[in-house]
Amino acid sequence: MSDSFLPTCILCLLALSSACYIQNCPRGGKRSQPDTSRECVSCGPGNAGRCYGPSICCGAALGCLVGSPETMSCMEENHLPSPCETGGRPCGDEGRCAAPGVCCDSVSCVMDSECLEDVRSDQSEDPSRLKTVSGEILLRLLNLASRGRRDF
């Protein structure tokens, strides 16, 4: 009986200990894979901004939009498997400079004088695209102003 007891105990211990090992790790360990940092989803008029939270869209040319229809594309950020990089300098407790004078985290935005200095715009923002967005906004304002004059 003792001859079969020892191999049985070893077999049981082996079975129990192999259940404790993580089986789905990549070769070389979890830190062997390169960081897959990506930019956050584009949002706002002309996709000129980046998502800072599920309902926050900010860009250097447009400021910050919170809870507006332009932020709907930011909701899909919650469903993506990897985190994103918003860009900008760190500010506040856990925020980043999102627009000139504005510091945002994933939940809210606050005015912050640290962000008045040289806000780093997103790498993918094309200056010609920003000009067209600014031009679109200016044209809309002019159209609204001219409509207001005709009504009087």
Swiss-Prot record:
The keyword Disulfide bond applies. It holds the Pfam family Hormone_4. Disulfide bonds join C20-C25, C40-C84, C43-C57, C51-C74, C58-C64, C91-C103, C97-C115, C104-C109. InterPro entries: Neurhyp_horm, Neurhyp_horm_dom_sf, Neurohypophysial_hormone_CS. The keyword Cell membrane does not apply. Its main location: secreted. This is Vasotocin-neurophysin VT 1. It comes from Catostomus commersonii.
